[in-house]
Curated annotation (Swiss-Prot):
Coiled-coil stretches noted in the UniProt entry, renumbered to this chain: 64-298, 330-614, 641-713
GO biological process terms, semicolon-separated: homologous chromosome pairing at meiosis; reciprocal meiotic recombination
Protein keywords: Chromosome, Coiled coil, Meiosis, Nucleus
Localization (cell): Nucleus; Chromosome
Annotated gene: ZEP1
Main location, first listed in the record: nucleus
Species name: Oryza sativa subsp. japonica
Any Gene Ontology CC annotation: nucleus
Residue ranges, annotated region (Disordered): 841-869
Function: Required for chromosome synapsis and regulates crossover frequency during meiosis. Acts as a transverse filament protein and constitutes the central element of the synaptonemal complex.
Assembly: Interacts with CRC1.
Protein name from the UniProt record: Synaptonemal complex protein ZEP1
Tissue localization of expression: Highly expressed in panicles.
Phenotype seen when the gene is deleted: Decreased pollen fertility due to abnormal synaptic behaviors and increased crossover formation during prophase I.
Amino acid sequence: MQKLGLSGLRGLEGFRSLAGSTSTAAKAPNPKPSSDIGGSTYGSFANLKITAEKLVKEQASVKTDLEMTHTKLRRATEQINLLEAKLQQAVNENAKLKVKQTEDSKLWQGLDSKVSSTKTLCNQLTETLQQLASQTERAEEDKKFFEEILGKNSKAFEEFNCLLHDSSIKLECAEQMIISGKQEMLRIKQEKEEMDQSYKEQLYASDTTIREKNSLIKQLEDSIEQNKARLLYVDSRLECMEQELKLKEDVCICLKENLASTESEKNDLKLRNEGYTLEVQKLSKDNKELNELLSGFTVKVTELDKEHTSISSHVTQLISSFERYDGKVHEEKMLMIKSAKDKFEHLQNQYVNLISENNALQTEIEELKSRIIELQKTQEIVMVQHVEECQVAEDKIRRLESEAEISASNISQLEKVASDLEGRVQKLLEDSRSAENHKQELLQKILKLESDNQELLGRVQSVLNEKSNDTESLQGEIAKRDQQVETLENQVNQLCSIIDEKEQLHTCAVEREKNLEEQKLQVQASLAATESQLTEAKKQYDIMLEGKKIELSKHLKELSLKNDQAINEIRRKYELEKVEIINIEKEKAEKLIKEMENKCNEKISENRQDSERYLMCLKEEHGSMVARIQQDNEHKESTLRAYHKEELQRIQSQAENELRERLSSLRKDHEIQMKSLTKKHEENCQKLQDELELQKSKEEKQRALLQLQWKVMGETQQVDQEVNSKKEYSVSSIKRRDPYIRKEHQLQLVSPETKRKDVNLSGIIQSPITNMLRKVEKGTQDIPKHRKVTHHEYEVETANGRITKRRKTKSTVMFGEPNTQKSLHDTADKDPTKMKKVVAGSHPHPANIGELFSEGSLNPYAEDPYAFG
């Protein structure tokens, strides 16, 4: 419609110029007489011919200008729409990224709270395990006490044997006194029976204690079975995690397939762009053909001029020819308009298809992003110690935002150059490359997440291996305890046999037996108290575990509900914004179409009225104009032809120069932009490489530090002292030495290969059993060794040293052996290979891993606060 309006205006302006020339010619005086009518008609016909040629040329130029302007306007509108869509997409993506950042921050806060709660639980568990260990130590001390009492009884039996020997000698000397002592023997028999009953009661009490200990052993076995059940549960959980990982791998494969489909669609778009360029070339060829047609029409007009030499006979033919010419011009215009409309509709359909394809691609990209978010959420539950990687991801998101801002600035610059086709095609190619780069980055992130999952699986498997080793060690300890119980039973049987043999000499031991009974009652009371404490501790532990499990399940449910609500709200908002934007654009388009239609109709009506007026004027003034045009026609033909040729050559040269200048300027601008973009991309790549190198160096440093720490821990040697005889040590020294703790200590001396394997898991997962064993080791190292002293002197350990004191008692006293620790230090220091690894100023035997890590350069918390959870 705009083409029709502009071409009509140009045609009307040409008719007005003709009318003005005719009117001026009519007003001018006629110098020739009326007798020379033939010459004047010939000149007027030549003038008409010139004006007709001018009109044809002007119409052709107007058509070309209109077509160029229309194509430029269409391209400009399309580019503006595309740029607006890109800006909206960038704004939406920025909003989504901000929402994601807020959600990630909330999730990290929740995870920190969970980690703190789990740490408190671990501390409580370690405390309870320490209490249980102390109680077991007390029970073992009670066992040793009973063994001491049995030794005293054996000594008493030996004394009784001596007395029996003496009494037998006396009986041989005093056979005469047998008759008088029969009554006394009867009394002795009664006392023996009483003693038998008392000893039977003692045996029954010892049996009850053994049964109680058996029950304790059974309880320990039940706890081991519970641990096995927990291990089975952990195995099932691991299988579930493996299934989830397989599902995630399938999702990654689907994502790769979607990426391949998007690349194929990009190739299709490139092919379509090439088709559009071919169509533009075809349009240029059509324009050339139209120009040739116009030249043919000019030839036909010249032929008509030759044929119409006489005015009187051929004026009607001229009028009819003009009318035919106008009809043909109108028909050509209508055909051009129809073809342009068809092409415009075809282009609109293609544009709609492209928009739909872009929307489909956007939906697919959003689905991919949502899947990636779900994968990140599932892995964030397991990945608590990967905070640095998340920080790097946030930095990358910020860089992407900065790149989006830079792209927005580039878009504002590109809007100025949106009038040319070449710039637009190159920008589309750059956008496609950037999209491919983004997809490659997403693929790299997915690969990183998969590698992290594999690392976590390896860590969990190592933890399971450690737990299985712990269970095996506990089973070995239980078997050893069973052996100890059997040895005790054998000793009891031996004592019973000794008691049966020496029933006659138990009259003197009644007082001692009473003391023993009192001690047994005290021991039984202490055992009952310990059992009650154990049951209470177990109940408290079970209650704590159940409460924590309920709290964790509630917290997880709340988090899932919040995430679902936030996702639904974002989707609703996005859909509402889409609908609003579509409605607004539709309303704008309808308004523009209506306005254009109204304007075109108004212009058409005005043009029709003007054309009718001018036709009337032309018919009235035609008779007067013909004579004057024929007179001036012959003189002006030669001059006009020369003038037109020069103008055409000049215009062509100017147009070619302008096109060359524009093309050169556009190429230069394009090259400058490409260079700037390549420089920016290279700088970004270098920054990313530098950051990766820094991270790698940090990780290598941490690994080296951990290896040094574990090597230092492995080099602490432990001296095992062998027991040669019971005479070298007193009963109090046996109390202090704990074989059970020594065995636990030996079980923890693991090979260096297992230590290397456990390096990665030392700070991640610390089981309560390992903490308990380490604390027991610490206790055994702190206990000083003793030796037997039979003198009346004894020493007291103070802060400043030892002080010797004298007392008149004859009890055995223990001296600590200060040289044992020194010997340990000396043996550790003599090794030259170990001297290099120990840091100057540090203790050679650190009591705990925390003390080791708090030393100078071996502290990993100085650079990485999240290295050990």
